Amino acid sequence: MKKWQLFGTTAIGASLLLGACGGGGNADSGKGEGEVKGDGSSTVGPIIEKLNEKFAKDNKDVTVSSGTSGTGGGFEKFISGSTDFSNASRPIKDEEKKKLDDKGIKYDEFKIAQDGVTITVNKDNDFVDELTKEQLKEIYSGKAKTWKDVNPKWPSKEIKAYSPDQSHGTYDFFTEEVMDKGDIKAEKNADTNVIVQSVQKNEQGIGYFGYNFYEQNKDKLKEVKVKDDSGKTTEPTKKTIQDGSYALSRPLYIYTNEKKLKDNKGFQDFMKFVLEDKGKSAEDAGFVALPKKDYTEQQSKLDDIIGKDSKKDDDKDSK
């Protein structure tokens, strides 16, 4: 029987711990065992949860846990060596790479899904249908105090801007893509659900977060189209997010500790499952799968990292 246990890790989430059920065995017979620990992005968290649910069915001797302390918080734990993998909604930063290098930790990057940072306003807002990146920058830099400051045709009502806090990869992505690395002046919160609720309650509210959060709350919020640098206006949909035509599309990642991956058959089995799933769990969680060839290419990359011995074990196990 599958067991679920929740352990609070931060204000924004909890660690999901799954004791798997199904086939038996140990490392010698080709089956993994033991613990696999992760942490990181609250955006990626629901995908890992869906993957764990499926993986648990055939891997009773492997326990996978994953916290949601944010991309930055996840990397801190990854750098300290307390986790085997780190979930991220942005690429690893140079300073994080350096810290890993200083500790002699080799890591590998895997893309597992595609997301689109979605801009939303209050459901009763009847004038904001689209925004340029420059207008978003004016709002989130504090330069535009009222909607009229953004567009002379809009009402002179004070804007209430909401944002994830600095622990989120979504914050870093927005800072990079929209703010040109400038400061965000908005009411920040570690809990994305609080941002959703704030925009819902405030008629002059505006907020941003991952596409799946919008999908879960689209009956409560109004989505805003984004005009890219070429002047093309696009709304976030599964198609525009996957093909990258939506201006705020981004990949979602799992970073793995290479030594721990090589030493832990259960970890290897989990990562193989992640890639063999080919984005089905991401779609189940409201995200967008990568093109199938991307998963196939990364499966080859994983095989190269793990080595031929692991592949032989799998061949034995399947006979």
UniProtKB/Swiss-Prot annotation:
Q: Where is the signal peptide?
A: 1-20
- Say where the lipid (S-diacylglycerol cysteine) is covalently attached: 21
> A single Gene Ontology molecular function, please?
phosphate ion binding
- Subcellular localization, per the record? Cell membrane
Q: Which gene encodes it?
A: pstS
InterPro entries (alphabetical): PBP_domain, Phos-bd, Phosphate_ABC_transporter
* Protein family according to the UniProt entry: Belongs to the PstS family.
Q: Where is this region: Disordered?
A: 25-44, 61-98, 297-319
Membrane topology of the entry = Lipid-anchor
Pfam families registered for this protein in UniProt: PBP_like_2 (PF12849)
Q: What is this protein called?
A: Phosphate-binding protein PstS
